[in-house]
Amino acid sequence: METKDWYKLTFLIESDSEEIIIWKLNELGIFSFSFEYLIKNENKKEVNIWLPIDDWDESSRSSFEKIIIKLLNINPPKNKFFEWSIIKQEDWLTSWKKYWAPELVGNHFLILPCWINLNKKFKDKQIIKIDPGAAFGTGSHPSTYLCLEKMENILFSDKKVLDIGSGSGILSVAARLLGAKEVCAVDNDYLAINSTKSNFQLNFGNLNKLNTYLGSFNEVILKNQLEQFDFVLCNILAEVIKGMIPNIYKCLRNNGEVIFSGILNSQKDEIIKILIQHDLKLLDVSTRKDWACISAQKASNST
């Protein structure tokens, strides 16, 4: 069996730069990373990023460093700011897990990495078991928090739900836990689809009530004639959301609702404007750090 080793990239940032780093890593399709508090300096955080060696040659690594430097608007001595090391595959498979811990979200959810035993004090929570593997995080991104917090106040019982950009499947699992009768998960990455199925199986012991679709949202909707959803969950980047709104409107039933997350605060006004232009009624806007979550509704008399 072929094994692959990993680069581990480490550098320090100001604590308030964490969100913009997360946003850029998600935009680049990089999901294996962690942020560590520095006991001696609360204003700084250590960033650790793991990258498959086979996919990152010297040129790619250099380009990535330039992206980070530009993003942080700094001019550090290059050989002192970034620290690259090589992690063997067998070490990676166990060492990366130490960076994840159970996380409470809102009043009802507990995100539980599958290798950690449940503490009895959390037994009254809705437990979302996650095995993120090497490709996805455990749902600690602020946009995921916002979406889950919004979901816990919605009645999903007997509802039909669409999860766009399902990733690890955390929102699909949450919808099913809250009583959804059918969950459709769409992602253009086969690793994400596999992860969604795996985590659904982990939580429920089967794939009942889950349908998955590989491909871009706009193509999947047209090809499979997906429609009449009670709720649409869309936790992806704002630039991608903008091009999806017309088809999201079409696949919602009358009075159906959509939750958009993955939007920076600086982008929310533009998204709200586009929603209104497409006859979606704004219901609520919530924020967490630099991120916004927007919910909207299709009118009852829409055609």
Curated annotation (Swiss-Prot):
Catalytic activity, EC: 2.1.1.-
GO molecular function, one term: protein-lysine N-methyltransferase activity
GO biological process per UniProt: methylation
Keywords linked to the UniProt accession: Cytoplasm, Methyltransferase, S-adenosyl-L-methionine, Transferase
Gene Ontology terms: cellular component: cytoplasm
Family: Belongs to the methyltransferase superfamily. PrmA family.
HAMAP family: Methyltr_PrmA
Protein name: Ribosomal protein L11 methyltransferase
